[in-house]
């Protein structure tokens, strides 16, 4: 079975073996590390499982703004106190407008 949690962890670490394994399934053009990580983050948000929150908190600090934006969106979908606290903290230091909008939107969806 497919282990999204392990894949996200491997992508955070930029594990070449995992990237190559995915590339063999979907094609090298679609297997760029940042693209794979963004897709995995979106999938994690759609699963809405709290187990992904610690990984998404890590990706919320990624240097690539679209990955931070997707992470904020996913944390908003999952919700919970830990996600809300991480989003509020990230908002304080975020400078990218798109990421700020995603964080604010995510915070608005968490009860």
Short names for language-model regions:
Residues 5, 15-23, 48-61, 80-92:
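Amphipathic alpha-helical scaffolding segments comprising HEAT/armadillo-like alpha-solenoid repeats
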Residues 20, 54, 97-101, 105:
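Polar/charged alpha-helical tracts
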Residues 34-49, 58, 68-80, 89, ...:
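Structural detector for internal amphipathic alpha-helices that build alpha-solenoid repeat scaffolds
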Residues 33, 63-65, 95-96:
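Short inter-helical turns and helix N-cap capping residues of alpha-solenoid HEAT/ARM repeat scaffolds
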């Amino acid at each position: 079975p497919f282990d999204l949690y392990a894949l996200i962890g491997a992508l955070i670490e930029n594990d070449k073996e995992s990237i190559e394994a995915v590339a063999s399934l979907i094609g090298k053009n679609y297997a760029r590390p940042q693209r794979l990580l963004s897709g995995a983050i979106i999938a994690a948000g759609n699963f809405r499982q709290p187990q992904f929150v610690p990984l998404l908190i890590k990706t919320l600090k990624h240097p690539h703004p679209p990955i931070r934006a997707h992470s904020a969106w996913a944390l908003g979908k999952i919700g919970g106190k830990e996600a809300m606290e991480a989003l509020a903290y990230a908002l304080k230091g975020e400078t990218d407008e798109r990421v700020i909008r995603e964080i604010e939107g995510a915070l608005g969806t968490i009860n």
